[in-house]
Amino acid sequence: MTFSIRTVKREIRILGLDTCRINEVLGAVVRGGYFLDGVIRVRLPDNHAARDLASEILASKYYPELRAIMLHDPGRRLKPSLLEKVARLPVIAASRTNRPGRRDAAFHSAFGTLFHQSRLPKSVVDKILSLTWTCGGLPEPARIAHILSKSTLNVQHGRGFGPKP
């Protein structure tokens, strides 16, 4: 299955996913690199994680406007190819370090070097990364999802800060 994004607009909607929490994935829907449109939280069992996550993405209200998924998965808990197949969206697996034994493509910017893997053409991925990387060590979709994942934000009820459930 091949995906194509014909034009990459300034306000492309990207779903950034972070898997730093145990049995939970937090996502941020970001428009370009400047606007946060929404937050997605999915509790995942250990088995069938990518398939369950993809079905939750398909059921979300943000799905019709999403153009790609940016995955920050330092523990390699999800299979990007399976997520891409079930969600029917291209996946950009982004990391600050190159994975051992893999030759991921490198993207260089003023903020540093980012290694990525995707089935999209390198020119399209580079354009998406240049539009969404505005500050910090990761592009905004993955960075916001990572901040949410590392915070003590109680996303269950959509309110305030509090202890993790």
Whereabouts are the PLM-identified features?
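Charge-biased, low-complexity intrinsically disordered regions
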Residues: 1-2, 42, 49-50, 54-57, ...
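Two-metal-ion RNase H-like nuclease active-site motif
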Residues: 1-21
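Long, charge-dense
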Residues: 46-47, 62, 78-119
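Short coil/turn connectors at secondary-structure junctions
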Residues: 9-12, 64-66, 87-89
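Structural motif
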Residues: 18-20, 71-74, 96
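Charge-patterned, long linear interaction tracts outside catalytic cores
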Residues: 124-165
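A glycine-rich, hydrophobic loop/mini-helix early in the fold
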Residues: 23-68, 74-75
